[in-house]
Amino acid sequence: MQRQSQSSGLPRNDLLGSYAAQIATGAANSDEMLAPDGSVKPAWASFVAYLRQLSPNELAFRFARGDQYLRDAGVLFRQYDETLSSEREWPLSHIPVIMDESEWQQISAGLIERAELLEFVLRDFYTDNTLVRSGQLPATLLSQNPAWLRPMIGMSRQNNNLLNTVSFEIGRGPSGKWWVISDLIEAPSTAGFAIENRIATSRVFSGFFNSANIHRLAGYFQNFQQTLFDIKGDAEGEVALLSPGLLNEYYPEHTYIARYLGLLLVEGEDLIVQSGKAMVRTVAGAKPISLLWSRLPSPMFDPLEFNPTSMLGA
C-alpha cells in the first residue's frame, strides 16, 4: 500500500487546531509550544509550519519510521522485579522539545554552576572537610550516610574532577522558570539514548532537521572523549568502560557509548590486577588498562574496600 505524502495535494492537517483551542480557553496551565492566547511561540514557528504541511497519514508513517529505527538499532530498556526481567522499547517522544538559543544558554550556565558546586562539595567531603568542620553541615550527614565511602578519604587530591559526568532532571515551574528536579551523579545514564533519540527524530522530520540550525550533540561526546584520553595521558594501555553487565537495564547504552567513544567495554570478571596494575583478560593474554570509567554504583566498584558482596567491580 502506498503512503500519502504532502505532494499528493491533500490539505494541510489541522491537528493543532483543537489543541490550540484548549490552550486559549485555559484548559492547560502552560505549554511549551503555544502561548496562552494560542499563538505559536517564536522558537517553534518554523517547526509548526513544517508540521502543518504533513497529512495525518504522512505523520503516522514518519512516527512509525522513527520507532522502527530504534527497534533496528536494538535500543531497549530492561526492567526487573523480584521474579523476572523484561525488555521494552525505548519510548520515543515523536515531537521534540524546542527552545531558542538564549533560553538554552541560560539553562546551561545554571547547570554548569550547579555541577561546579557539586564537584566542590564532593571534593571537600573527601579532603579538607571544611563544610563539616565549620559547622555549615552536620557531621552525621557524612558519618551516618552509607553513600559516603570512608576508604576514599584523602584520595581525591588530584587535579582531575571527581564528577566526570553529571546529569540533571529539569522541568518548567509555575512561574515559567526552569527548575532542577533532581541531581544524578552516581553513574548517570541516558546520554547514549539521547544520541539515538536525536537520530530517530532526525529521520522522522528529516526535511526540518536539514534546514534548521539545531545544536549538535557530537561536540559533547568529542569533548568528553578528549577528557578521558587527556586523563590517560601517555600511559600504555586501554581506556575502558566498566559495565555491570548484560543484565543491567542500561547495558544497551553502555555498549553504544563504548563503541561511539572508542572505549573497551569490560565487566568485573574481565579484570585482574598484576603487580598493582589493572589488566584485562584477552585471548592474547592480559593487557594493561590505563583508565577505567566505571558505570557502577560506587559501593559496588571494589569488594575489598566497599561492599564485600559485590561481584560486579574490579
Regions from the PLM with identified roles:
Residues 1-314:
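Preference for protein termini
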